[in-house]
Amino acid sequence: MLAIISPAKTLDWESAVPNFAFSQPHLTAYSEKLIKICRQLSPEQISSLMSISDKLAGLNAARFEQWQIEHNEQNSRAAIYAFKGDVYTGLEVETLSRDDIQFAQQHLRVLSGLYGVLRPLDLMQPYRLEMGTKLANEKGKDLYAFWGNIITDALQQAIEQQGDRILVNLASDEYYKSIKENQLEVKIIKPVFLDNKGGKYKVISFYAKKARGLMCRYIIQHRVTDIEQLKEFDLGGYQFNPSSSTQTEFVFKRDLTK
C-alpha cells in the first residue's frame, strides 16, 4: 500500500529534526530544469504567476537563485519535516517514532511541483512552486505538461515494490491531477471526510485537510497494508460510513460538537 499527500505552502526550517539517514530525491534533473526557468522570472513576474505578495515573490526569487543540484544537510531538510500546514498538523510527524518514519519511507509519498515525488526522508531545499502553476516550459504551458508521465511512472515503481498494488489518494485535486490514473496498474482508494455542520454532512476544507493527515498517521502507526484496515480509521472522531461509500471511495463521517 502506498499513500500520497500534497505538500504545504508554508515551510518549517526551524524545528529540530531527528538524526536519520536521509535520502536523496530521485528527480532532481527535472527539478533543475524548472529552477532554470524560474530564475529567468523577475520578482514581479513571480508575484503575478503565483498570485503572491511582493515580499513572498522576492523571497522565492532568492530561493530559486540559491537552489543547488546537490542536496545535503546544510542546504536541505527532510521533506516530511519541511512542510507546515493542515495536513501536516494532522500527521504530527514530530511525535512519530523512528520505526514509524522508516515505515513511512516505504509507504508514503509527497507530490511536489518542483521535485515531482518525494519520499519522507528525501532532502529538499526551500521552494514554492505549486502544481497548478502555469509555468510555461519546453513541454507545454504548465507543470502538468512538464511532468507528463514522470510522476505516474515513479509511483508505479514504488507501488510495485509493495506487492499489493494499492494507492491511497490523500492528495488534493490540484496535485492528484499530475497523475495519469488510467496508466496506473493499481487499485485506487480515495478517503472522503465529511463533517456534520448544521444538520448536513459536507466536506469542510480545513477539517478535510487535517483528516488526510490523520489518516496518513493512522496508516503509518498501524502499519496498514490492507484495504479493510483503512475502514477501521477512527482518529479525530471520524467513523467509516458503509452506506455512503463505494469500492473506491471510502466515506468517513463526523458530527461536530456545537
UniProtKB/Swiss-Prot annotation:
| GO BP, sorted A to Z | response to hydroperoxide
- Pfam families given for it? H2O2_YaaD
Q: Which domain of life is it from?
A: Bacteria
What would be one Gene Ontology cellular-component term for the protein?
cytosol
Q: Enumerate the InterPro entries for this protein.
A: YaaA (IPR005583)
PANTHER family this protein is in?
A: PEROXIDE STRESS RESISTANCE PROTEIN YAAA, PEROXIDE STRESS RESPONSE PROTEIN YAAA
Q: Which family does it belong to?
A: Belongs to the UPF0246 family.
Instruction: Give the protein name, as stated in the record.
Output: UPF0246 protein HSM_1789
Ranked from the top, the taxonomy reads: Bacteria, Pseudomonadati, Pseudomonadota, Gammaproteobacteria, Pasteurellales
